[in-house]
From Swiss-Prot:
It comes from Phenylobacterium zucineum (strain HLK1). GO terms for biological process: L-histidine biosynthetic process; methionine biosynthetic process; purine nucleotide biosynthetic process; tetrahydrofolate interconversion. Belongs to the tetrahydrofolate dehydrogenase/cyclohydrolase family. This is Bifunctional protein FolD. GO terms for cellular component: cytosol.
Length: 297
């Protein structure tokens, strides 16, 4: 059996199309243009790529988009002042501070300063609490992308046994909450879980978000299970010649080639969950704009 490959590119393009249609409707019917502000502190190359992508995609769907690039030596009070200005700006409905921040800045304090109504990363404690309580919330983008991919692949998730490997605030815990709300039976596993392979083998849905390259092997996967690989790990090429040249590639937390022989469906890395994350950021910005404007539906 060869698993179905869940194509993140196709799903992300579809979601961006839906967002663009909704933005056009809001602009036509309500004269409301959803606005996203992205804040980048420092010059981390990966963060610059992510921020540029977010800006380009938000403009492409018709949103108002602003990027604030601050020097690496920006003080905490300066960053908090900018966040306060964005909180008060009626043209901005979503605020995203690109993480990680330089080490001298307090990430938790910065996230806490963002208005929960504009927290499109879904990291504010208010949104985390609302999600855990089953109340409407802005949900972290990667877990939201995982849920969309699962529903596209499986339809109704009711009664499925789901195992989430990883307990981070960014992915593991929120994706578990979303799966619970979808009426799955959920287990959160992690590096200290006893007999982790056996726990994984119980899963109809296996979400890997542990940050260890190719940790989850094919014989950890229940035949026919749906595997969502959130991991993004840079490793040397298997080819010794390329590895000797310092060349690297991206792999997930799942051993992809082995998973293909066992799973019913699996997301690739790259080309899977990562592509959904930016699309879900756009969706969250539209959701925030509608809630702030009191627009239903």
């Amino acid at each position: 059996m060869t698993a179905k490959i869940i194509d993140g590119k196709v799903l992300a393009e579809r979601l961006r199309g839906q967002v663009a249609d909704e933005v056009a409707r809001l602009r036509a019917d309500y004269r409301l243009q959803p606005g996203l502000a992205v804040v980048l502190v420092g010059e981390d190359p990966a963060s610059q790529v992510y921020v540029r992508s977010k800006g380009e995609h938000s403009l492409a769907v018709g949103m108002h988009s602003v990027t604030h690039r601050l020097p690496a030596d920006t003080r905490q009070d300066e960053l908090l002042r900018l966040v306060a200005e964005l909180n008060a700006d009626p043209l901005i409905h979503g605020i995203l501070v690109q993480l990680p921040l330089p080490k001298h800045l307090d990430e938790k304090a910065v996230i806490a300063a963002i208005s929960p109504d504009k927290d499109v990363d879904g990291l504010h404690v208010v949104n985390a609490g609302r999600l855990a309580s089953g109340l409407p919330a802005l949900v972290p983008c990667t877990p939201l992308g995982c849920l969309i991919m699962l529903r596209e692949t499986l339809g109704d998730l009711t009664g499925k046994r789901a195992v989430v490997v990883g307990r981070s605030l960014l992915v593991g815990k929120p994706v578990a909450q979303l799966l619970l709300q979808a009426d799955c039976t959920v287990t959160i596993a992690h590096s200290r879980t006893v007999d982790l392979p056996a726990v994984c083998r119980e899963a109809d849905i296996l979400v890997a978000a542990v940050g260890r390259p190719r940790m989850i092997r094919g014989d950890w996967i229940k035949p026919g299970a749906t595997v969502i690989d959130v991991g993004i790990n840079r490793v040397p090429f298997d080819d010794p010649e390329k590895a000797a040249q310092g060349k690297t590639k991206l792999v997930g937390d799942v051993h992809y080639k082995e998973a293909l022989q066992v799973a019913g469906a699996v997301t690739p890395v790259p080309g899977g969950v990562g592509l959904m994350t930016v699309a879900c950021l756009l969706q969250n910005t539209v959701t925030a704009a509608k809630r702030l404007a009191g627009i239903e539906g």
